[in-house]
């Protein structure tokens, strides 16, 4: 099994074969929400594209996608769809935009960056199969063997390639703050969770890193998020879904949007990096971390934070582990209760042997 550093080399090699140096591309599905994992994927994607000497000529999120603006900014060249875990019917907004881009550009090469595929209903995968079957050049990078099997068996016309998660392109990281609690349990509160945590020992902290349902914090990241929306509105790209009908002054609106796409990637890069670093700061609070989030696990791995990882309801965490990382010192638990037991043992080992020796 490759180590994390080897995974970065695989990403460079796989993406480099699809995107020659000096090429221009579009990059769709910017994640303008508070899931740290998706922000880290965008951050890693932009860094890797820069390293490969690939220029992003157009960027959009699901609200601001406009085929006319994309065509004007990028008359030819591939369109990239951000990687992650939203290829399926669990996250309809992102997936609907993915299908629309495939339908709008049936002759253009479209590259779906590394994804896990998860459909809950046969009708939903049949809809995607209908769209991919009409497309001439759709390259689908998948993060695990189960997704590869689905792509090859049920999505006609797709070139499916196994590839690690994009976030591993970040390479080695460091803790952003000293640990302040013995164990931090960063646990999902959504449909991908396999269940709640049990009662934790005194002093341990449980939380998630999304802000769904809560107010935005008064931070630079929140200000940037609001600024990005206001910027879209000023250039005639209001964040509406489904997209609004074309304006009467179509030529002027497209001109404003072409200017916008030259600046939006920079703005979104700052926001994505800030959100990803926020997640790493949260994880840095624990001497030991328990998590069922794939990207919390990967951030801990890259930053050398001792942790115990559990799987999600759709199996994507362990599927990625088994495809790319094997064991490599990864402590895995089959249940939240087992994760708590392992974390307690790991904490005792840190106390007995010293953190540096155990982390090695």
Model-derived features: positions:
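Active-site anion-handling motifs in enzyme catalytic cores
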Residues: 1-360
């Amino acid at each position: 099994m490759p180590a994390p550093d080897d995974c970065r080399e695989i990403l460079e090699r796989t993406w480099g074969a699809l995107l020659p140096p000096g090429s221009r591309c579009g990059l769709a599905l910017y994640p303008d929400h508070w899931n740290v994992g998706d922000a880290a994927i965008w951050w890693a994607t932009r860094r890797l594209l820069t390293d490969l000497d690939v220029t992003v000529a157009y960027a959009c999120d699901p609200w601001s996608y406009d085929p006319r603006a994309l065509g004007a900014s990028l008359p030819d060249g591939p369109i990239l769809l951000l990687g992650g875990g939203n290829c399926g019917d669990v996250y309809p907004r992102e997936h609907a935009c993915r299908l629309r881009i495939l339908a709008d550009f049936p002759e253009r090469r479209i590259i779906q960056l590394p994804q896990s595929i998860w459909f809950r209903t046969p009708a939903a995968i049949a809809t995607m199969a209908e769209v991919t079957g009409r497309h001439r050049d759709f390259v689908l990078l998948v993060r695990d063997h189960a997704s590869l099997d689905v792509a090859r068996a049920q999505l006609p016309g797709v070139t499916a390639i196994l590839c690690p998660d994009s976030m591993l392109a970040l390479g080695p990281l460091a803790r952003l703050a000293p640990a302040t609690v013995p164990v931090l349990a960063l646990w999902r509160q959504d449909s991908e969770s396999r269940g709640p945590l049990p009662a934790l020992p005194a002093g341990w902290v449980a939380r998630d890193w999304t802000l769904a349902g809560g107010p935005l914090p008064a931070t630079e990241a929140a200000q940037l998020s609001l600024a990005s929306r206001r910027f879209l509105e000023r250039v005639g790209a209001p964040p509406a879904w489904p997209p609004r009908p074309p304006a009467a002054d179509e030529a002027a609106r497209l001109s404003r949007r072409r200017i916008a796409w030259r600046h939006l990637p920079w703005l979104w890069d700052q926001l994505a990096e800030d959100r990803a670093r926020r997640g790493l700061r949260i994880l840095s609070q624990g001497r030991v971390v328990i998590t069922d989030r794939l990207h919390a696990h990967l951030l801990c791995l890259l930053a050398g934070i001792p942790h115990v990882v559990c799987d999600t309801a759709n199996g994507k965490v362990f599927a990625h582990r088994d495809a790319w990382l094997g064991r490599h010192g990864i402590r895995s638990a089959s249940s939240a209760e087992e994760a708590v037991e392992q974390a307690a043992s790991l904490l005792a080992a840190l106390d007995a042997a010293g953190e540096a020796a155990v982390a090695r």
